[in-house]
């Protein structure tokens, strides 16, 4: 039996007030993702899929190769961290998705990106 690679994904988001224009329904958020390889062999992140939902229920799907122009190889016990951004029409929303990855044998697998919130500070309780 082939062991499924153990990958941990953590995300932190912040509101970027200096780039946002609330009166024009433009709310900019930055998020930092940390992908940790908790397994015993190398893995490589090849692609991403995001489902972005604003507080009106409008959903946008984003998919593509790699992240921030890279397809990082993550060694056992190591992590890859990057920061990216999203623009919403509402001050509150969520993101979730998955990464398309391969293990050291070239076997494809998906790693879930848990849902996280995008919110301006006044809406966080």
Swiss-Prot record:
Q: Name one GO biological process term.
A: error-free translesion synthesis
Q: What SUPFAM superfamilies does the record point to?
A: ApaG-like
Please state what the protein is called. Answer: Protein ApaG
Which InterPro entries does the record cross-reference, listed alphabetically?
ApaG_domain, ApaG_sf, Uncharacterised_ApaG
Q: Give the superkingdom in one word.
A: Bacteria
Residue ranges annotated for the ApaG domain, each copy included: 1-125
Gene3D superfamilies tied to this protein: ApaG domain (2.60.40.1470)
Source organism of the structure: Yersinia pseudotuberculosis serotype O:1b (strain IP 31758)
Q: Which Pfam families match?
A: DUF525 (PF04379)
């Amino acid at each position: 039996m082939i062991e499924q690679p153990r990958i941990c994904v953590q995300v932190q988001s912040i509101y970027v007030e200096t780039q946002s224009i609330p009166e024009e329904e433009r709310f900019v958020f930055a998020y930092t993702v940390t992908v940790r390889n908790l397994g015993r062999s190398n893995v490589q992140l090849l692609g991403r899929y995001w489902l972005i939902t604003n507080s009106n229920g409008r959903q946008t799907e984003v998919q593509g190769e790699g992240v921030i122009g890279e397809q990082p190889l993550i060694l056992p016990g190591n992590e890859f961290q990057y920061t990216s951004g999203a623009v919403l029409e509402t001050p509150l929303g969520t993101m979730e998705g998955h990464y398309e990855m391969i293990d050291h044998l070239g076997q494809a697998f998906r790693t879930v990106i848990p849902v996280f919130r995008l919110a301006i500070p006044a809406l966080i309780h």
